[in-house]
Amino acid sequence: MKESIAVLGAGSWGTALAVLLAHKGFRVNLWARRPELATALRETGENKTYLPGVRLTGTIIPTADLPAAVKGAGLVVLSVPSHAVRSTARLLKPFLPKGTVVVNTAKGLELETKKRLSQVLVEEGLDRVAVLSGPSHAEEVGRGLPTTVVVAAADRETAEYVQDVFMDPTFRVYTNPDIIGVEFGGALKNIIALATGMADGLGLGDNTRAALMTRGMAEIARLGVALGGKVLTFAGLSGIGDLIVTCTSMYSRNRRAGILLGKGQSLEEVLDAVGMVVEGVRTTAAARELACQHGIKMPITEEIYQVLYKGKPVGDCVAALMERPRTHEVESGDW
């Protein structure tokens, strides 16, 4: 048996990663915040709430005891929603040996501070942090379908350590030193998935979806590069790769939420119907404020913000985007 790994967060993604790591021979302590969920996982051998149909092997140990989950773990995987990253880090820190690698898998920004989640973890005293991102729906990873992702960290040793832990015949992992770009790509694509979902809900067709994805990628890269990311990162797995899967997949919560909004449901009704965290809602507000602070144009993000927080009709956003003043496609383009 290999070293043990703690996966904190027993939602769909945490469960899928626990299954992947257990398949590789690791003992996995899967921490659930709610004791009743941990009990259900132990008794049924399945996460029927968040990842039904995927069996949990005997080397996955569900628990609601955080100190027990972390004790002896060579690696900690953080799979909680973005708004819970800081509070979970504070719970984790007293029990974490110095130098333990913590891999964040949430894709979002902290709404209150507008900070990337790796920044939040470092602020809370976690000294070796990596980020795992890319086009990777839990429903497919849990079933062992081929998936390719990227891990970013401040140093190569940490990134390659995480790469080796997760690399599997069905789960290919690349490394990237650009942690800023990787995090912004993973977070901001959820906004564009809301937009494409709204277009689908309105029945606007493939042309509209393609336009939103393409111009959405321009917005993502514009803000990400302004805040220190590398432009090529946004052409990679954590950028365009994650954008494609999140904007087109039936598994995408953000796309599903957008579809329901496009069909006229209120945000409250949509969140209740989806039943799980829709990261794009909070990320839209955080990204809009960052864009305003840094003078970055993000017209799609602005329109999604108006829908989510100001009650603007979705159909009016289409007209607002289509009737913007004419401009160049590529800002640096010369004739």
UniProtKB/Swiss-Prot annotation:
| Top EC group | oxidoreductase
InterPro entries in UniProt: 6-PGluconate_DH-like_C_sf, 6PGD_dom2, G3P_DH_NAD-dep, G3P_DH_NAD-dep_C, G3P_DH_NAD-dep_N, NAD(P)-bd_dom_sf
Q: Where does NADPH bind?
A: S12, W13, R33, R34, K107, A138, R253, V277, E279
GO molecular function terms noted in the UniProt entry: glycerol-3-phosphate dehydrogenase [NAD(P)+] activity; NAD binding
Under Enzyme Commission nomenclature, its number is 1.1.1.94
Q: Where is sn-glycerol 3-phosphate annotated to bind?
A: K107, G134, S136, K189, D242, S252, R253, N254
Task: Give one GO biological process term.
Answer: glycerol-3-phosphate biosynthetic process
Entry's Gene Ontology cellular component terms: cytosol
Pathway info: Membrane lipid metabolism; glycerophospholipid metabolism
Where in or outside the cell it occurs: the entry states: Cytoplasm
- Pfam families recorded for this chain? NAD_Gly3P_dh_C (PF07479), NAD_Gly3P_dh_N (PF01210)
Which residues constitute the catalytic centre? K189 (proton acceptor)
Q: Superkingdom, according to UniProt?
A: Bacteria
Report the function annotation for this chain. Answer: Catalyzes the reduction of the glycolytic intermediate dihydroxyacetone phosphate (DHAP) to sn-glycerol 3-phosphate (G3P), the key precursor for phospholipid synthesis.
Q: Which family does it belong to?
A: Belongs to the NAD-dependent glycerol-3-phosphate dehydrogenase family.
UniProt protein name: Glycerol-3-phosphate dehydrogenase [NAD(P)+]
User: Lineage in the entry?
Assistant: Bacteria, Bacillati, Bacillota, Clostridia, Moorellales
**Its gene?**
gpsA
